[in-house]
């Protein structure tokens, strides 16, 4: 007697031993972008930021941009060009790096603010979000042994920047900017190559050198990255 295979049996035969892929955490990681434009005789605001596919990270980014705009407007609310003949400006632009399977999404916001002086101030703001729970991957969450990790990261960044800055190298500035303390390395993202650390103008070199970034490959940080994060990154 022959039995008609059930649908489940057919699927098992077709799939064989192939591993089942987990469903993506959310897709696409960026749903849309928000643009804020305001112009008065004394001010220009031109801000953009992403809306991610989870509500928690989107609120964090939105609140940061809103507070930055609020603080910018407080600098000189009555500015009308009568004393200083140039408008004040605030600009933000963003970039997003999802990891291959979407577990982690990194966001970098470039902020430029001009409120007088010889040139604008520029600085990076970064976040790494775990799309499994919407939480932020802080430096402490990335590196359980923060002291050992900062010592390693500091030494590697010093080596790279000492070579790449060339004529812009100012040893005292570099020494201060890469000291193994949390504030010097809190602006980072996760990429396919490793952990990228961003340094604002003046942190490690003169303003003319611009923003600096050092990407440290994951294998150079072996044993220092939190096991659950390292496992997820390796799996991707």
Question: Where in this protein do the model-derived segments appear?
Answer:
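N-terminal secretory signal peptides that target proteins for export/translocation
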Residues: 1-2
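Bacterial N-terminal signal peptides
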Residues: 5-16
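Compositionally biased intrinsically disordered regions enriched in Thr/Gly
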Residues: 20-236
């Amino acid at each position: 007697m022959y039995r008609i295979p059930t649908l489940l049996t057919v699927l098992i035969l077709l799939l064989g031993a192939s591993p089942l892929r987990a469903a993506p955490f959310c897709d696409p990681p960026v749903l849309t972008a928000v643009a804020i434009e305001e112009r008065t005789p004394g001010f220009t605001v031109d801000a953009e930021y992403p809306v991610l596919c989870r509500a928690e990270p989107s609120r964090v980014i939105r609140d940061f941009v809103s507070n930055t705009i609020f603080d910018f407007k407080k600098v000189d609310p009555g500015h009308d060009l009568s004393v200083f003949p140039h408008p004040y400006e605030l600009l933000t632009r963003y970039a997003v790096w999802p990891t291959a399977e979407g577990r982690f999404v990194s966001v970098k916001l470039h902020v430029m603010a001009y409120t007088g002086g010889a040139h604008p101030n520029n600085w990076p703001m970064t976040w790494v979000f775990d799309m499994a729970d919407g939480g932020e991957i802080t430096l402490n969450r990335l590196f359980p042994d923060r002291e050992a990790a900062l010592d390693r990261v500091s030494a590697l960044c010093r080596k790279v920047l000492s070579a790449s800055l060339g004529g812009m190298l100012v040893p005292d500035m570099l020494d201060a900017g890469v000291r193994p303390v949390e504030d010097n390395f809190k602006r980072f993202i996760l990429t396919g190559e490793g952990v990228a650390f961003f340094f604002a103008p003046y942190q490690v070199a003169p303003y003319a050198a611009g923003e600096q970034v050092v990407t440290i490959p994951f294998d150079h940080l072996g044993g220092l990255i939190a096991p659950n994060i390292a496992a997820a990154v390796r799996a991707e």
